[in-house]
Amino acid sequence: MVIPHIICLPMALHLWTCRFLSLGRPATNRRNCRRLRRRAVHRQATRPTRRIHHSAPQSFPQGLFNCAFVLLRRHALCRRLVGISTHVRAFKNCSKSDGPRRHKRTGQNSRVCPCGSWIYRIVSDRSGAFKCARRRVL
């Protein structure tokens, strides 16, 4: 009598976790995420971003934790692409950010932050200092 409970309980927990995590992703974010990913690959300007498109690393254990990890990672990807403005401050303080870089296709000055895979356009204000402005894709 114990064996069915051992099998059914993790399965029920697995399904509940998947459903619970998928409720946090609005449909518009998912649609925008797909559209942005298509455009990003088309522009060929997202070399750092391609790393986060993988669903899960190969060494990650399969099962409940894998499902939760994939959904959380997808949710983070959509939120990152659709836009969170608070990362602008974190980008300015990031020690890993490299200098201005020219895009292959657009030719615009841009700066890439490898830690968060964000792409910014370098905008010069009147004082001559450079600040980072997030590119609007939508």
From Swiss-Prot:
Disulfide bonds: none annotated. Glycans are attached at N93. Secreted effector that completely suppresses the host cell death induced by cell death-inducing proteins. It comes from Plasmopara viticola. It comes from the Eukaryota. This is Secreted RxLR effector protein 91. Its main location: secreted. Residues 1-18 form the signal peptide. Keywords: Glycoprotein, Host nucleus, Secreted, Signal, Virulence. Has the canonical translocation RxLR motif, but lacks the canonical EER motif, which characterizes most oomycete effectors identified so far. One of its GO terms (cellular component) is extracellular region. It is found in: Secreted; Host nucleus. Belongs to the RxLR effector family. A motif (RxLR) lies at residues 34-37.
